[in-house]
């Protein structure tokens, strides 16, 4: 391993021990904000510190085995130990490189998930419903909470658009690669000739930001309209103008929220989604400005981004970004998404590692 990387790991290991000592300090325990921040830092450093300790131990084992090679009686055993230790050292070095990759500060956050029907009319709305169900199943399996913020139902089922907040550990980091265009190829229920139709939906995943980090929005830049909500809600539906539509005039971003009966709650929800959308637009703009020649696996949520194709007649799902095809469509639609998410996360890590070695 390069001396520069070893030096970096030693510094992180020392910081881990320092933070551990600080967490036992009565003054820090009394300061809840500081204690929480240090607890987070400790958790982030724990894996790299533990892995580095294991790596150091293996280097000692290699040294011991090499010394034993000089003893004819011990040579055979030493060779076997040396081979095993070198293998383990390589594995730990790979793990450490991944642990050293720059972390996206948003990865641990909750996320807003938007699914929007694109080309394909009723069939696109039905597919948007299928996609939302797929993500809900995935969230359920990971014990995440799904809260619908706003939805507009399709005429024959599904959704023209649905926005949900997904809360839990590492939601954004896991779902961020879902942003982009999703195509479906299947025979619609209304198709009498049995012809396969192609429809499309767009998915956008944005981190939920803490209030302190939300972009500054000038109230003068907002147009706020109220209207009567439609959809489920029993006797209270259409009796009050509780639904909210907020338009951010400088960007043209529009957010509607009609899920709550209270206008204030709908407004608060709509503003949090608006803040996340503005932040996402600014981030995308920044990434484009830095736009390296390196490919960006993170979709923009744009229809032109073709992430995946779900082909029902063939039972096939294809991720076009990494040329991955699986004939496991039924499982995918039931929310078993790790087999699609994991390869793209690994590909992203490989790209980051390549960038890191170029810098060095």
From Swiss-Prot:
GO terms for molecular function: translation release factor activity, codon specific. InterPro entries: PCRF (IPR005139), Pep_chain_release_fac_I (IPR000352), Pep_chain_release_fac_I_sf (IPR045853), Prokaryotic/Mito_RF (IPR050057), RF-1 (IPR004373). Pfam families: PCRF, RF-1. GO terms for cellular component: cytoplasm. SUPFAM superfamilies: Release factor. SMART domains: PCRF (SM00937). The modification N5-methylglutamine is found at residue 235. Residues 284-313 are annotated as: Disordered. Methylated by PrmC. Methylation increases the termination efficiency of RF1. Keywords: Cytoplasm, Methylation, Protein biosynthesis. Its main location: cytoplasm. It is found in: Cytoplasm. It comes from the Bacteria. Belongs to the prokaryotic/mitochondrial release factor family. PANTHER family: LD18447P. Peptide chain release factor 1 directs the termination of translation in response to the peptide chain termination codons UAG and UAA. This is Peptide chain release factor 1. It comes from Salmonella arizonae (strain ATCC BAA-731 / CDC346-86 / RSK2980). The lineage of its organism: Bacteria, Pseudomonadati, Pseudomonadota, Gammaproteobacteria, Enterobacterales. The gene is prfA.
């Amino acid at each position: 391993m390069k001396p520069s990387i070893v030096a970096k790991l030693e510094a992180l290991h020392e910081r881990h021990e320092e933070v551990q000592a600080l967490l036992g300090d009565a003054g820090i325990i009394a300061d809840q904000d500081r204690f929480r921040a240090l607890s987070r830092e400790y958790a982030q450093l724990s894996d790299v510190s533990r892995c580095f300790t294991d790596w150091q131990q293996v280097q000692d084992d290699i040294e011991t085995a090499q010394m034993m090679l000089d003893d004819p009686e011990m040579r055979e055993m030493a060779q076997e130990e040396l081979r095993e230790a070198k293998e383990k050292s390589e594995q730990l070095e790979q793990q450490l490189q991944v642990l050293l990759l720059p972390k996206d500060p948003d990865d641990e956050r909750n996320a807003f998930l938007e699914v929007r029907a694109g080309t394909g009319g009723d069939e696109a709305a039905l597919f948007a419903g299928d996609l939302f169900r797929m993500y809900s199943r995935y969230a359920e399996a990971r014990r995440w909470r799904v809260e619908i913020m706003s939805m507009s139902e399709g005429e024959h089922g599904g959704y023209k658009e649905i926005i949900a907040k997904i809360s839990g550990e590492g939601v954004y980091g896991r779902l961020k690669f879902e942003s982009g265009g999703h195509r479906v190829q299947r025979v619609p229920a209304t198709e009498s000739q049995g012809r396969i139709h192609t429809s499309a939906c767009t998915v956008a995943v944005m981190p939920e930001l803490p209030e302190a980090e939300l972009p500054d929005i000038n109230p003068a830049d907002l147009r706020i309209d109220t209207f009567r909500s439609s959809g489920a809600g029993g006797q209270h539906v259409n009796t009050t103008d509780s639904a909210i539509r907020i338009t951010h005039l400088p960007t043209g971003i529009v957010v509607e929220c009609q899920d709550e009966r209270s206008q204030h709650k709908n407004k608060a929800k709509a503003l949090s989604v608006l803040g996340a959308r503005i932040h996402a637009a600014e981030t995308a703009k920044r990434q484009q400005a830095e736009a390296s020649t390196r490919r960006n696996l993170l979709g923009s949520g744009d229809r032109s981004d073709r992430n995946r194709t779900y082909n029902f007649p063939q039972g096939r799902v294809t991720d076009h970004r990494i040329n991955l095809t699986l004939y496991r469509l039924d499982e995918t639609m039931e929310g078993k998404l790790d087999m699609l998410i994991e390869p793209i996360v690994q590909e992203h890590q490989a790209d980051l590692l390549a960038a890191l070695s170029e810098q060095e």
